[in-house]
């Protein structure tokens, strides 16, 4: 084990925990406040104390099914225009639970090569035959589907978590329909951010009705905690009965459920408009400086390549009171290390301008621009 740790350190891949606390759009490390460019609280609404009980007595199928779960799930179904929804303790568990419940051993799963690890693990656990298609490549997906006979599932993220680009859902939904496939969308980073009233990437691209199963998170755009799936009633009922990550785990605390209900019932549009104003300003600023990014969302990677250079880049930003994490293998491919930044509604114009100023200095210092 020590040898493995030494090798990780030599490869600039060793990860360490650091003690932090969050203050709106800032992060406090060693009693020093930094501008936080690594938050998933996109709308900037995660504030205040949470009341109610901090535990449930057991799993939801035993005695932990607080009455407010149903209220929350009805709100989520309305949000996604689906028949039924079910809440999981985390988004990761929602992916594991939904995919392993719906997909069977003799099925074929077509998964984008840059899908989140929770999707990858869920596909493996399902026992299905897995076909990986090139990232966001509708033609490659079509070719692979045409070569396959049997029940087919297509799984993609809406907004890709490490690149910030958006799935080619218009083409993918048409291909899915033409091949009689079942389309599963993980919209963890698009939900509550994109579309009318934050209904997600499917809504902004006009294909909501063509998506069969939605999987998403409550801990990002909604600023709460947990994950959920929304689909037709039979799909959700199957997950309730077969999903191990739902059946064999304690239910979320009532405090979290009530907090999520409060967030869903609040008017989030002002925060969402502020977020998009910040996103556009940051993208434009990066472009003016000379950075090239394929992102079209609040997730913006600066591609570095070399792992050590990415670590040094991150340390330089931190020295200027900006916190943005270097992302390395195995989260991304070797040689594709990056600084992954996420813009939120917390950020002020002054803070965005300062971040761009520091990023320009860092880009020139490390010969990225």
Give short role names for the model-derived ranges.
Residues 40, 131, 135-185:
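Active-site phosphate-binding strand-loop segment of PLP-dependent enzymes
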Residues 98-117:
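Conserved PLP-anchoring active-site segment centered on the Schiff-base-forming lysine
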Residues 203-238:
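Active-site PLP attachment segment
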